[in-house]
Amino acid sequence: MSDTDLYVPLAEGDLALEPLAERHRVGLRAACAQDAEIWEIYPFSYAGDNFNPQFDALLRSQPVRRPYAIHHAGTVVGMTAWIEHGAPGWSIEIGNTYIAPSMRGTGFNDRLKRLMLDHAFACGLERVGFKVDVLNTRSQAAVRKIGGVQEGVLRRERRTWTGRVRDTVQFSILRSEWEARQS
């Protein structure tokens, strides 16, 4: 599997993922501004004055992080990314995900993750990981809902932009587990 196989536009109905580019800046800024409080439990803040520096860093983060703009019916409603995790061609992480409040609780995130997981496993990957702040119980529940298996808690794994030292819950889904859920 090559990067050109994995990091491609993906779409299903009104849901589309496009590799993040400068043209997404304004739409993503507007989406991120819809929930200023959520950034307290993220490693980085995309709110207010933090947005432009974080967006610029995200654009420069390849090849380790391959970010997408998430579209619903043509409107940018968030972001997500493939993140190198483990052996290239074997394992990848889905992370850096933010979805605007209007799309939460609608099944949109479930569709998004299914689209990405289907694609990752179709590209030949064996494992997809997820790292979630221990305080982010909504995201933990979402990962469990799609079949993520909790592998453990990485204690004091990183310092967030607020200075808080976070514990991180590690999840994964294996190809065999995903295939069993789909049959």
Give residue spans per PLM region:
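Conserved acetyl-CoA-binding loop-helix of GNAT-fold acetyltransferases
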Residues: 105-119, 141, 145
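Acetyl-CoA-dependent GNAT
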Residues: 53-91, 95, 101-102
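Active-site acidic-Proline motif in GNAT/NAT acetyltransferases
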Residues: 100-106, 135
